[in-house]
């Protein structure tokens, strides 16, 4: 594996990391032209920005053109798998592998790997949309290449 990476929910990290990403976004979107201005708006020092700017990235921005694997826990209801497949297709996802386990105690596990290079949105949007499908109980991110 190239690099030493972790996927961490931002809720458990100090606010400074999210502020660095916010400053990066201000600069990228052209809302500010100077790093000094971006750091002031974000509420961080320039030294903090420079310390972390090359190591912190928004998950959605780094996810294009890659493969992602996630698991879904779904209720044993007719059409749930079809709904999941249709939604991924509507969002431009290319399903590489899909595996549904035998339902036990009224729920089944679905494991999906997709190529995200053709997604209309980002991975967060896709996973949020999948969680809105009726009878999808839980989604768990497994890995990203």
From Swiss-Prot:
Signal peptide: none annotated. Residues 69-144 form the ACT domain. HAMAP family: UPF0735. It comes from Clostridium botulinum (strain Alaska E43 / Type E3). It comes from the Bacteria. This is UPF0735 ACT domain-containing protein CLH_2637. PROSITE patterns: ACT. Belongs to the UPF0735 family. InterPro entries: ACT-like_dom_sf (IPR045865), ACT_dom (IPR002912), UPF0735_ACT_dom-cont (IPR008310). It holds the Pfam family ACT_4.
């Amino acid at each position: 594996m190239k690099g030493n990476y972790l996927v961490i929910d931002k809720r458990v990290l100090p606010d400074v990391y999210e502020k660095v990403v916010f400053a990066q976004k201000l600069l990228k979107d052209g809302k500010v032209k100077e790093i000094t201005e971006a750091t002031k708006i974000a509420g961080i020092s320039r030294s903090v920005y420079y310390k972390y700017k090359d190591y912190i990235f928004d998950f959605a921005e780094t996810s294009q053109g890659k493969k992602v694997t996630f698991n879904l826990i779904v209720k044993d209801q007719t059409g749930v798998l079809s709904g999941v497949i249709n939604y991924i297709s509507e969002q431009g996802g290319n399903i590489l592998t899909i595996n549904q386990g035998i339902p036990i105690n009224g729920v089944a596990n679905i494991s999906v790997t997709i190529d995200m290079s053709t997604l209309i949105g980002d991975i967060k949007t896709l996973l949020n949309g999948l969680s809105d499908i009726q009878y999808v109980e839980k989604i768990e991110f497994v890995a990203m290449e």
